Amino acid sequence: MAKHLYKTPIPSTRKGTVDRQVKSNPRNNLIHGRHRCGKGRNSRGIITARHRGGGHKRLYRKIDFRRNQKDISGRIVTIEYDPNRNAYICLIHYGDGEKRYILHPRGAIIGDTIVSGTKVPISMGNALPLTDMPLGTAMHNIEITRGRGGQLARAAGAVAKLIAKEGKSATLRLPSGEVRLVSQNCLATVGQVGNVGVNQKSLGRAGSKCWLGKRPVVRGVVMNPVDHPHGGGEGKAPIGRKKPTTPWGYPALGRRTRKRKKYSDSFILRRRK
């Protein structure tokens, strides 16, 4: 990501960065409004996801995660910002007149050609089944169920690696470190998701984070005892427990939260780190 550092004496933007290489005007037929209700609340109005709320209004971009335009080459026309994800998206014009958005592969530029299908070249941005990919291929936007669309490795900078094939299954190493079995009939896109340096972006001020819909985070140790198990005490007091806990008293920092006896346990060869 080509970052531009603000040169201004104003404290709020002195260390802020912005990327000026992306287009931000989406196509009208590929967007639609989406009602964002709750802002972290459930149907009863109770907070179930903390630190969410506010934020700028967004239009949802329809992303083609299925890549079902078989054997029809497309050309990258624009690279655009998407407020609904940390990865960039690019507009593809296919040879039959179809126009779709896909996740921007790292290194792809305007004018590049991509294609999806079987027996297509192993090049950046092409989508093909795992059975046609050689071992060691880097990929993203991986399907778990054939025809359902990519569900794995879709965040900015995410990349998975094909490490083995046996029978009808392929073994993948995911960005989290998890080693998992996936059917070889599932589609995946070659390459890494773009916008790798998103974690190096400096917002510059608290208001910029509010625009993203992220509310302030308060430490439990500075709360009152009625609000958090870590709260209370005189002055700067410790948490008063052997181990840190969540606001509801459950163990924090290391406790496994995955549901036991899940149907996909047999497909996971090694848990994520």
Swiss-Prot record:
Predominant subcellular localization, coarse grouping: plastid
Note the coiled coil stretches, chain numbering.
none
Q: Give the GO molecular function terms.
A: rRNA binding; structural constituent of ribosome; transferase activity
Localization, UniProt = Plastid, Chloroplast
Q: Does the keyword Iron apply?
A: no
Q: What is the annotated quaternary arrangement, including any partners? A: Part of the 50S ribosomal subunit.
Query: Can you tell me which family this protein belongs to?
Result: Belongs to the universal ribosomal protein uL2 family.
Q: Please state what the protein is called.
A: Large ribosomal subunit protein uL2cz/uL2cy
Q: Which organism is it from?
A: Hordeum vulgare (Barley)
Originating gene = rpl2-A
